[in-house]
A protein has these predicted regions:
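Domain-level signal for soluble alpha/beta catalytic cores
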Residues: 1-364
Length: 364
């Protein structure tokens, strides 16, 4: 398995709608009616069902749906040494809706936690999947800690000093996942999306340079036989969004210089702009695959197949067809609440991605 074969031409971002038994178990756990051990047992059972559902849908790359998490990012970050979860006054404010108030902040010197629970979570998923598919594990990008609200708490004098420790923590994380058997890891990254949204601010160039440095330094530690991809997100909560903005302001750095093996890019509506920024991939010698998120994970309606194929064809002006892939635009449940659709509608979307990809590229 190399970066030439992954991502496949049909892939998914990673999160799935939480099953009803899982929702009920988490509610009982929060109310003190279930022990941690009992919740874990339900999680294990529901993840096993989810794995089978993915296989039944024809998916070759399998995730745990982020079933053990409340948020796509916080559960990982708060288990790093030097990072804590806390309850701010407000949650994340999306378009017309707000998340529950919970976030992370620096509380000490940052380092990798050798007892990080995600390593055990990965091992469990790997055991469930066995030889039936390829396991992908998703974690937040190191850039998710670069916001002032995260790092500027008095522990570090400068963001650059803080970033060095974050970079080392992520290099150690890559090694820990690799040693556990992980060969396909994904960094989910809203920070690049926020830069697209805030490119006129005076700190933009410094923020972009720091984001690029973080990724370059961390990916330099990647073993040759490990695939690391990224998903660039603009927010995904209850079928709403957080950010808007085309890729143009970040394309030279993200597309032209980073050494990811794949780039999951949102392209489901006008908020993401056009395909022209993809021309910067021609300057990137690594030739990571470009995964077009043309299928919405926010809404249940199936897109027009002819229109999707036409957009893929349009993209070949900038990226060769063989370097392109197709996926939903984001996960189906970046938080435990999930987007507003049924599980049946979710799987219809997933099967649709597989169907279109086979018609465009054939079998992987």
């Amino acid at each position: 398995m190399t970066s030439k074969t992954l991502p496949f031409h049909a892939d998914t971002v990673g999160s799935y709608l939480r099953s009803q038994p899982l929702k009920e178990a988490r509610a009982k756990f929060a109310a003190g009616e279930l022990s941690r051990e009992q919740l874990t047992e339900v999680e294990d059972q529901e993840i096993a069902k989810l794995v089978q559902a993915q296989l039944d849908a024809g998916i070759q790359v399998i995730t745990d749906g982020e079933y053990r998490r409340a948020f796509w990012h916080i559960d990982f970050l708060e288990n790093l040494n030097g990072i804590e979860g806390y309850h701010p006054e407000h949650g994340y404010k999306f378009n017309g809706v707000e998340t529950k108030p919970y976030n992370t902040r620096c509380c000490g010197k940052v380092s990798w936690n050798p007892n990080h629970p995600f390593i055990e979570h990965f091992k469990k998923l790997k055991d469930i999947v066995g030889d039936r598919g390829i396991v992908k594990y998703t974690i937040p990008s190191p850039n998710q800690l670069m916001y002032p609200i995260q790092w500027d708490t008095g522990v570090y004098a400068t963001r650059a000093e803080f970033a060095k420790d974050v970079q080392q923590a992520y290099k150690d994380a890559i090694k820990a996942f690799y040693d556990a058997g992980c060969r396909y890891l994904q960094f989910d990254d809203v920070y690049w999306g926020s830069l697209c949204n805030n490119h006129l601010k005076p700190e933009f160039e410094a923020d972009k340079a720091q984001a690029l440095e973080n990724i370059q330094v961390v990916l330099a530690a990647k073993p040759a036989d490990m695939v690391i991809t990224t998903h660039v997100c603009r927010g995904n909560f209850r079928s709403t969004y957080l950010l808007t903005g085309a890729y143009d302001p970040i394309a030279d750095a993200l597309f032209g210089q980073t050494q990811y093996d794949g780039y999951f890019l949102e392209y489901d509506d006008e908020r993401s702009g056009g395909f022209e920024p993809l021309k910067h991939f021609a300057n990137n010698p690594h030739k990571g695959r470009v995964v077009l998120g043309l299928i919405s994970s926010k809404f249940p309606e199936l897109e027009d197949k002819t229109a999707i194929k036409a957009r893929i064809e349009e993209t070949t002006q900038y990226v060769p067809l063989e370097q392109l892939c197709l996926s939903p635009q984001c996960g189906f449940a970046s938080t435990e609440e999930g987007n507003i659709m049924t599980e049946a509608q979710q799987w219809a979307k997933v099967r649709y991605v597989e169907e279109i990809a086979k018609e465009v590229w054939g079998e992987d």
